[in-house]
Amino acid sequence: MNTKMVTLPIEYSDKNVTAHGGLSLLKRFIDKIGIIEALDGFDFPKPGSNRGYDPSEIILSFWLGIWTGASRYIHSDWVRYDKVLQEIFGLKLMPSQSTYSRFLNKFSQKKNNEIFPSLQDWFFQKLDIGKITVDFDSMVITRYGDQEGSAKGYNPNKKGRNSHHPLLAFISQTRIVANAWLRPGNTAASSNCVEFMKETFNQCLSSKDVGLVRETKGFTLKR
């Protein structure tokens, strides 16, 4: 089979270009739902100096790294050189990997409890899906190495391995996680189930009309 070679023109330009122009659609989306303005209303950890980035800028920049394929902090650095993408999202400068790690390390369990249930509720207010079905479940996640918070406990698939034993709440209609608590692997299935359900209904889903609740055995053992 003969293949005809096509001569493609090569041109040079002094204009900035990006391989991620399609993300402009995401920019329109976040502008439409007003999520950046909503983030400004939450008490996120503040920078250590007046020259630091606003929390909403750090979060938006972190999203850009994830949307362009980053799976490690260091990968987010490539977005710092994409001036077109920064212009699309209205960012004058972008944080370094150390800024992300410092910001995320400031979150404590107390701070998480103050912010994320209310943030989840804000998100679910945007979903017009009528009455919802909420599924509660717990699962075992096997961990390898020395993962923070992991411990040896009930693990039917990898006996003797460290694990986490999280509690999860899902919206059945959308398959979206409504709430999640990460627990050590040596935690009993029913531990903190009632408190978890209260937070889910009273905070994360306070604006939704719940029509049906389904639970696994671990949740029913507590009552």
Task: Please annotate each region the language model reported.
Residues M1-D209:
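Dynamic "connector" segments at or just before major functional cores
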Residues A189, T220-L221:
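Alpha-helix N-cap/loop-to-helix initiation residues
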Residues G145, L221-R223:
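A short acidic (Asp/Glu
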Residues D137, D209-T220:
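Acidic/histidine-rich, metal-coordinating catalytic segments
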